[in-house]
Curated annotation (Swiss-Prot):
SMART domains to which the protein is assigned, alphabetical: HOX
Protein name: Homeobox-leucine zipper protein ATHB-22
Pfam families: Homeodomain
InterPro entries linked to this entry: HD, HDZip_class_I_plant, Homeobox_CS, Homeodomain-like_sf, HTH_motif
CDD domains given in the database record: homeodomain (cd00086)
Keywords per UniProt: DNA-binding, Homeobox, Nucleus, Transcription, Transcription regulation
GO MF terms, alphabetically ordered: DNA-binding transcription factor activity; DNA-binding transcription factor activity, RNA polymerase II-specific; transcription cis-regulatory region binding
DNA-binding region: 76-135
């Protein structure tokens, strides 16, 4: 079966062609499974994908590299400990928190640990994200404690203000009373 037949090139309908105008919306209410290609003048009935394309896995991503499949190695606890020590060193070396993994260092770690450089880079990226989240949690906690202290101080000052205002009112009412008594006598 020839997929790119001359009838397709001439614009005629081909049962093995997936039109870019096909309506993939199954909830559109259009139950006749026709192509939206009517705008272009060509109308196709039910879409058929050739069995050969489905069986060969056409369009699926392949995990093969030069014909060989490479499986992602799971890191051992020793490798993880080594990476963690390396990450802690990186934190100490970069106090400004710009912990971008140097490509030379990445390759060195890759060779030492027997892992793919991409695995090293992803591990560092994930660890950096976790570290940043932890730093934000600590910062939030310290800010929350400071806020609680300031909030409590504000409440104490407001209570003191209320007491002082009441003392002023009492004092002024006493003075008015004394003035009234002096005026009456």
């Amino acid at each position: 079966m020839e997929y790119w037949s001359s009838s397709f090139i001439d614009g005629a309908s081909s049962s093995s062609f997936i039109s870019p105008f096909y309506n993939f919306d199954h909830f559109s209410g259009n139950q006749d499974n026709r192509c939206l290609g009517t705008m272009m003048g060509a109308q196709q009935d039910i879409l058929h994908v050739p069995l050969a394309m489905v069986e060969s896995g056409y369009g699926e991503e392949s995990n093969s590299f030069n014909g060989q499949e490479k499986k992602k190695k799971k890191m051992t606890s020793e490798q993880l400990k080594f990476l963690e020590r390396s990450f802690q060193e990186e934190i100490k070396l970069n106090p400004d928190r710009k912990m971008k993994l140097n490509p030379d260092r990445k390759m060195k770690l890759s060779k030492e640990l027997g892992l793919q450089p991409r695995q090293i880079a992803v591990w560092f990226q994930n660890r950096k994200a976790r570290w940043k989240n932890k730093q934000l949690e600590h910062l939030y906690e310290s800010l929350r404690q400071e806020f609680d202290i300031v909030s409590r101080e504000k409440e104490l000052l407001q209570e003191e203000l209320i007491q002082l205002k009441s003392m002023i009112r009492e004092d002024s009412s006493c003075k008015k009373k004394q003035t009234w008594e002096k005026a009456c006598s």
